[in-house]
Amino acid sequence: MRVRRVVDGEGEQLRALRLRALRDAPEAFGSSAEREAAYAPAVWAERAAGAETVTFVAVDGARWVGMAAGRPDGAVVQVLGMWVDPAARRAGAGRALLDAVAAWAAARGAERLELGVTDRAPAAAALYRAAGFAPTGEERPLPGDPPRVERVLHRSLTIR
């Protein structure tokens, strides 16, 4: 398994992976497979090109088995869309994806990573804690599903 950045021209592969994630864990995301399946090919091409958000994928052979994105927000990089195929879990893909986003963010001068996790994703919360994330104490509405909330976790990228 290796982790690499999604590049321009891989919009269709990114779409297929994202839809798998949304179907596998609809409670973990603020969107739905039905909604995103209707997005135009140009949306996926833009996401793959990484103009605003960078996406990393975990690849096993030729199969994409996981993803995580990073979106800059000042000194913070938001980790978005984190997902690993159930068959590839507990093999290091999740940690490798988080580390790839962290390395990219640190190279951009970011001070920390932030992400949100719902109470319906205890395995994800455990992964984030093991990867050095800690609670901020903040809760925010889950994007796309405002009645639900996600807890905000962060990971420092600076050495003290």
Question: What do the PLM-derived regions correspond to, one by one?
Answer:
Residues 1-3:
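Extreme N-terminal starter segment of soluble prokaryotic enzymes
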Residues 5-87, 98-100, 104, 108, ...:
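Acetyl-CoA-dependent GNAT
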Residues 12, 91, 122:
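Loop/helix-junction capping segments adjacent to catalytic residues or to phosphate/diphosphate-binding pockets
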Residues 92, 109:
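Conserved G/P- and acidic residue-centered "switch" motifs that form tight phosphate/ATP-binding loops
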Residues 111-114, 118-160:
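C-terminal "cap" of GNAT-fold acetyltransferases
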